[in-house]
Each structure stands twice: as C-alpha cells, then as structure tokens.
C-alpha cells in the first residue's frame, strides 16, 4: 500500500515539474519574440512600426492570455498615430487600440496604471 502511495506521489511530482517547465518555456519564448520584434524599431519608420504591430498581433494570437503583446500593440499603434496623424491607417489603428485596451481591462493580472496610461494617450 505504501509503494502505491509513493508511486502516485512521484508521478504527481513529475507532472507538476513538467507543467511548470512548459509554462516557463512559453513565457521565455514570448519574451524572445517580443524582444525580436521591438529590436527592429531601432530606427522607427512608419513601415517598421506597422510591421511591429502586425508581429505583435501574431504573438498575441499565440499567447491570448498574456498582457504584454496587447500592451505593445496599443503602445506602438499610439506611437504610429502620433508620428503619422494624417496617414490612412491612423483612424483604424486608434479604433483597434481602443478595443485592445478594453481587452486588457478584462485580464485579471493587468496593471491598472498601464491601462490608464494608454487610455490617457488615446
């Protein structure tokens, strides 16, 4: 009887270790993808900002429960709108930014100060 209990304990321990390793790997992957995308903005042009926004949207699709891609989408959209106020994409980006901020408000672990800052710039 004690061997079966020990066996279950070992299996549960292995399961939890594996789960935590997978979660950590996903977080580091997301951080790496965001870092690569933002690194392309060393010399921000309207094209590079739009490409960064598109990449962040893909990252957000890969990690839908994470706030960081959503924050970067909103931030870069606002950045583009300030740099190119008369560009044809600006109005759509501002609408999408408002929707993104609304999504961020529904995430439990979202930082209220980040949301208020983005909403203030909107």
Where are the language model's segments positioned?
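Surface-exposed, polar helix/loop patches in the mature regions of secreted/periplasmic/lumenal proteins
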Residues: 90-122
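Amphipathic alpha-helical repeat scaffolds of TPR domains
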Residues: 27-39, 64-84, 109-122
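N-terminal segments that cap or nucleate solenoid repeat domains
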Residues: 29, 33, 51-62
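Bacterial Sec-dependent N-terminal signal peptides
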Residues: 1-33
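Generic secondary-structure transition motif, activating predominantly at the C-termini of alpha-helices
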Residues: 14, 38-42, 105
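Helix-turn-helix repeat elements of alpha-solenoid scaffolds
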Residues: 42-56, 87-99
């Amino acid at each position: 009887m004690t061997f079966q209990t020990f066996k279950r304990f070992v299996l549960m321990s292995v399961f939890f270790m594996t789960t935590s390793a997978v979660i950590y790997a996903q977080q580091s992957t997301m951080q790496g993808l965001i870092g690569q995308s933002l690194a392309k903005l060393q010399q921000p042009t309207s094209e590079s900002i739009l490409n960064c926004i598109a990449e962040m949207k893909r990252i957000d699709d890969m990690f839908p429960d994470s706030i960081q891609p959503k924050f970067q989408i909103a931030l870069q959209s606002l950045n583009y709108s300030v740099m190119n106020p008369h560009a044809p994409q600006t109005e759509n980006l501002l609408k999408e930014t408002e929707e993104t901020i609304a999504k961020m408000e529904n995430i439990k672990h979202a930082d209220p100060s980040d949301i208020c800052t983005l909403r203030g710039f909107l």
